[in-house]
A protein has these predicted regions:
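Catalytic cores and adjacent flexible loops of soluble metabolic enzymes
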Residues: 1-244
Length: 244
């Protein structure tokens, strides 16, 4: 078993390069042999991630660095290129039908990009890829299709502002849908126009941006993403129900 530490990536006045480097120094001193840059919401800025990778590699060249970045806001391919050019050793990818959307970039695209950049990367066994693709699609059709929100296959730049990870978008949209019904019933009684899901989604993202610094800028990964999202939802419901 290899001891690995994950640094959860986010953007805030607290989460500077020096902040992350200090944590990396501590966990390496405690025995970590690998560092994973866990960009769970895909909001890590490519240049920042490249600089952090280089800082760790320059000081601890023996440490394996892995990049785990989700595709949701659309920065992941640029981030992969930056971390690889600065010494990253491992990149997390996905295959169809689960790649892209709120998941990871597809391994075919990543390999193509890295080859063009001059990296030596293994060829893909396309027969194995297509077999795994078909098996995964069959499993989704039989079971997971009941649970996967189609919106999870869509990338959205809106995620950059709120910093919420794509993995919780399904539950958040379900919560928002139920809340919308309650809010619109109240608005209807007052003679006010109904709010669309887009109206509420933007208001929720704005509320997340308001709540997040007030709870200490926690990286929005489980369970903190749920805490912040739920506080924002309750605030939004209270605002609309009270009319203030």
């Amino acid at each position: 078993m290899t001891p690995q530490c994950a640094l959860c990536i986010t953007n805030s006045p607290v989460h500077t390069l020096e902040y992350y480097m200090n944590i990396a120094d501590q966990v390496i001193a405690a025995g970590a042999e690998e560092i994973c840059l866990k960009d769970m919401a895909g909001i890590g800025q490519p240049a920042f991630l490249g600089k952090l990778t280089k800082m760790i590699k320059d000081k601890h060249p023996e440490i394996i660095i892995q990049y785990h970045g989700h595709s949701g806001p659309g920065l992941s391919m640029a981030s992969i290129l930056e971390v690889c050019n600065n010494g990253a050793d491992i990149i997390d990818t996905a295959i169809e039908p689960l790649s892209w959307g709120k998941v990871h970039p597809d391994v075919i695209s990543v390999i193509s990009m890295l080859k063009n950049e001059g990296f030596e990367v293994p060829e893909i066994n396309m027969s194995a890829y297509m077999k795994a693709r078909a098996l995964t699609q069959e499993f989704i059709d039989d079971w997971l299709g009941y649970f996967i929100n189609p919106g999870n296959k869509i990338m959205s730049s809106l995620l950059l502002g709120c910093g919420l990870p794509g993995g919780m978008m399904g539950s958040m949209m379900a919560d928002l849908g139920g809340m919308r019904t309650t809010i619109n019933n109240v608005r209807k009684k007052k003679g006010e126009d109904e709010l669309s899901m887009d109206d509420l989604l933007i208001k929720l993202f704005d509320e997340v941006e308001y709540v997040w610094p007030r709870v200490g800028y926690p990286p929005l990964v489980t369970p903190f993403s749920q805490y912040v999202k739920n506080i924002a939802l309750m605030n939004l419901l209270t605002i609309f129900m009270s009319g203030t």
